[in-house]
Amino acid sequence: GEAPSDNPPYHMDPEGMMGRASPDQIRSVWLGWLENLASFHKINYEDLELSMIDKRSNESSHLHSDLQYYKSFMEWGMDGEANAFLEEVLLWLSENLPLNPNPKKLCWGDSRIGNVLFENFQVKSLLDWEMATIGDPLCDLAWGLTTDDVSSHGLNVEKLPGSISNEEAIKFWEENTGYSAD
């Protein structure tokens, strides 16, 4: 199979899989990613005896636990130096956590189209599982859409024709999982 390139990002790689693709093929890649993500989020991890990857089993909110992890990681990485912007972001996030998060599910962790192998623009394999955890499945959707935004708008590059909009992706995911992206 073949995966959308990371370096250069697929939105900037005319020789890569996505650069050679038609808009319909690019749409097929995105829909395949979303279909697999939605199916994955329906798996009952307890039936598979995967509860051992639930690093936050004693936390009342897995999203709160994630924020605490990233705050600790930031403090470690900044080596005692303050970063007003990141502190403001963490404060906003902690004050705006969803009141009713989705049920805890198996999460891929690095759920982006660059970690999917395709054959003829159809999903063949999902890769890169070292970030897998138990948490809010919305985090997987957000990660995939955010990494796409960073590799396009974040680099002042237009998304490829056929790319799915964030709004369409969210609607598809909600309809196919029964979970909320609010």
Q: What positions do the PLM features span?
A:
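Generic alpha-helical secondary structure signal
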Residues: S61-S65, Y69, A84-E88, F118, ...
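Short, surface-exposed acidic
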Residues: A82-N83, G178-D182
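ATP-binding pocket architecture of kinase catalytic cores
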Residues: G1-E88, N96-P103, Q122
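Glycine-rich "substrate-gating" loop/helix at the edge of Rossmann-like oxidoreductase active sites
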Residues: D24-I26, W129-T133, L160
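Active-site activation/catalytic loop segments of kinase-like enzymes and analogous catalytic loops
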Residues: C139-Y179
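An acidic site on a long C-lobe helix of protein kinase domains
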Residues: V29-W33, A82-F85, D110, P137-D140, ...
